[in-house]
Regions:
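Helix-turn-helix DNA-binding module
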Residues: 130, 134, 138, 146-163
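Internal acidic/polar
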Residues: 3-6, 93-118
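Amphipathic, Lys/Arg- and hydrophobic-enriched alpha-helical face
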Residues: 26-44, 61, 129
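Structural recognition of an alpha-helix C-terminal capping motif at a helix-to-coil junction
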Residues: 35, 49-56, 69-81
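N-terminal module of bacterial RNA polymerase sigma factors
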Residues: 1-32, 39, 188
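C-terminal edge and immediately downstream basic/flexible tail or linker adjoining helix-turn-helix-like DNA-binding
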Residues: 2-4, 12-13, 94-97, 155-156, ...
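Arg/Lys-rich amphipathic alpha helix in sigma70-family domain 2
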Residues: 80-97
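Sigma70-family region 2
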Residues: 15, 55-70, 89-91
């Protein structure tokens, strides 16, 4: 089940105020929301606080809020706004993106050497993503990791779709350039 299809299941929370559905929604979205918040505030502890604040506010105001058409978009927009307000209140500007967490490869290596090579490739990918400029990295995370369309990412970040397109092109070119020497091609 994709994040978007999960989001559709949770829209009923607003109509019913069901605590069990709310808890499921928190469990489903919290990891990606924390990761996104961390890309704005710069560390995991503050990101956790931002996401918790968003969910607390949603629970407290559930009766007054019109159910959103797109729960995933609504949550990411709320986290973005809360994180930016958090930075303003604490007198800080956006500093850097947190470490990119690469999920464990689904490729099952057959020997220790393959495991080491896969780990090294993941480390190179992580380093390449970390080397992106902050805005470029944020867009890359939304589009490639969270599955947002270019248009959704543009709306969420208050940018034009063309800007998102340009930033994604830059991100992909920089990542491929950084990874070029480390990629193994096995065409026989």
């Amino acid at each position: 089940m994709t994040m978007s299809s999960k989001a559709a299941d949770y829209s009923s929370f607003w109509a019913l105020g069901d605590l069990a559905v709310f808890k499921q929604m928190m469990k489903a979205f919290s990891p990606s929301l924390r990761y996104f918040a961390c890309s704005i505030v710069g560390n995991e502890a503050e990101a956790e606080e931002v996401v918790a604040d968003v969910f607390i506010k949603i629970w407290q105001q559930r009766a007054q809020v019109t159910p959103p058409d797109n729960v995933q978009y609504y949550l990411f927009k709320a986290v973005k706004n809360t994180a930016l307000n958090y930075l303003k209140q604490n007198g800080r500007r956006q500093t850097h993106l947190a470490a990119w967490e690469v999920e464990v490869s689904h490729h099952h290596a057959q020997n220790p050497e393959d495991i080491l090579i896969n780990k090294e490739q993941l480390d190179h990918i992580q380093a390449a993503i970390q080397s992106l400029p902050p805005r470029c990295r944020q867009i890359f995370i939304l589009v490639k990791e969270e599955g947002f369309s270019y248009e959704q990412a543009a709306t969420l970040l208050d940018l034009s779709k063309a800007t998102v397109n340009v930033q994604m092109t830059i991100a992909l070119k920089k990542i491929w350039a950084a990874l070029g020497p480390t990629l193994k091609y096995s065409y026989s």
